[in-house]
Amino acid sequence: MKKFLIFLLAVLALTFVACEKDKDIESYLDMERINSEFNIEKQDKEQIKFTDKDESRSVYRIFNFQKMKSVDFKNPKKIDKLEEFYLGKNCEIIYKDESTIIVLVLAQDNSYAYNIQSFDDSKTELMMAVSIGSDKELSEDELFNLLDEAKSFIK
């Protein structure tokens, strides 16, 4: 009887894990808020990309959330590979830790472009990216506020 119960629990656990993998990305995000405040540019089961409705904002944001394969998510060198990529494109690394990288991609003629990429496993294995266009240089605190805003979409 004990073996049967353990077997049953194992099957239920595997079923739960399999069901989680099949969930659409929107089941992890506050879609009501996203739909009311942003334009959805691209959406499928694995990813969603949305932008500010007001294109003339002084700080224009593009958010991208993507479910990742477990093997890619668990790669301990994923941030290092991103850093290598950005440095190869002559970008300036503003901040980097084991799950987040913030990069100044372009600064010219009072225009600034930033990328923030972060990985979150609180609900599922998600990659979050925020691309920012600004008419002023943003402080590290302002960039972290944008990262916090991106994280706030995860329910």
Predicted regions located by residue number:
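Short, solvent-exposed coil/turn segments at beta-strand boundaries
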Residues: 31-36, 53-56, 66, 96-99, ...
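Sec-dependent N-terminal signal peptides
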Residues: 4-13
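N-terminal "mature-domain start" segment
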Residues: 20-54, 83-85, 96-97, 149-153
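Signature of long, low-cysteine stretches enriched in small and polar/charged residues
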Residues: 84-121
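C-terminal motif of bacterial Sec signal peptides marking the signal peptidase cleavage site
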Residues: 15-18
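A short acidic-to-branched-hydrophobic micro-motif
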Residues: 49-77, 127-132
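Short, surface-exposed coil-to-beta transition loops
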Residues: 44-45, 55-59, 108-116
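Surface-exposed amphipathic alpha-helical segments
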Residues: 32, 129-155
